[in-house]
Amino acid sequence: MSLKQIILELAMKIMAASGITYFAHNIWLNYQTTHSITSLIMLAGEILTITLVIIAKPTNTRDFNPIPCLATILASFYFFFISLDSETNIQIIPDSVTAGIAIAGLVWQIYAKIYLGRSFGLLPACRTVVDTGPYKLIRHPIYFGYFVTHMGFLLNNFSLWNVTVLLCLYLLQFLRMIYEENVLCQNEQYREYKQRVKYRFIPFVL
């Protein structure tokens, strides 16, 4: 990688660490009022993500084009826009149920990230082709884990604002998937894997 690319990646890691610190502070303030386990589970997932971003192994195939960089920044720091206001948000179903949904999403994330290991990162890159475990079902299982966790959070903190934020987030996530696959398809092994595993995001659906 060039010096400029190294600086950009380091800056993104610092921003990610700063963002999760800000989010953790807000979650803690929210927990003192609502005692919502769901929010704590969501925080645990974000901490896991940032930890893996920081320790991700370097690669020369990362995509530093402006569009994937911007999509990654906006999608990775969505929690700056999430509302945790217990006075305006609506709890649609009990916290015990939404916590269960969020835990299921977090467990799936961990399951997928164990298989991916240090090949995880914020920007699209071709590090290692993984085709075992959850990657046998869908090509982007980590995103699916995020989605399930976020659905648990939304059912516990429902508002039109949060719906809008998450809709925007998953439009960006889908854009990231497309750019990630453009980079990964440089590898013939990944092109063969893509032919075998038809579903990108949700098992047997999408």
Predicted regions and their residues:
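Membrane-anchoring alpha-helices and their flanking helix-loop junctions
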Residues: 1-123, 152-206
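Solvent-exposed interhelical
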Residues: 127-145
